[in-house]
């Protein structure tokens, strides 16, 4: 398994915590989503997707076009339509550090 570095209290807006790693379906599209009702509806309609985001659509489109595998690694700070209690600048640094750990592990086995 992979253990990610913990987010500090400033990044989480609460207690320090170690991020969890999830594998599964992520919904992606070209529209910014900031509506809890829509997020919940999409979650129901698409079988419990783990997240909704925008950037992965471009990754998937390019991978499909060139016939290569694609992978999206996300660090999620909040739920669409919910108020975030995280400090965005602190979260970015912590998320980047965690992503680097994960990508190094992935590259080592590819």
Question: Residue spans of the language-model regions?
Answer:
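Glycine-rich phosphate- or other oxyanion-binding loops that anchor nucleotides, phosphorylated ligands
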Residues: 1-110
């Amino acid at each position: 398994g992979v253990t990610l570095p913990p987010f500090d209290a400033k990044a989480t807006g609460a207690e320090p915590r170690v991020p969890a790693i999830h594998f599964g379906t992520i919904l992606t599209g070209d529209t910014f989503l900031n509506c809890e009702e829509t997020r919940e509806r999409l979650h129901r309609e698409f079988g419990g997707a783990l997240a909704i985001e925008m950037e992965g659509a471009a990754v998937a489109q390019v991978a499909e076009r060139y016939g290569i595998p694609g992978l999206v690694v996300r660090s999620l700070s909040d739920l669409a339509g919910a108020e975030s209690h995280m400090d965005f600048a602190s979260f970015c640094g912590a998320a980047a550090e965690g992503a680097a750990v994960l990508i190094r592990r992935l590259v080592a086995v590819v």
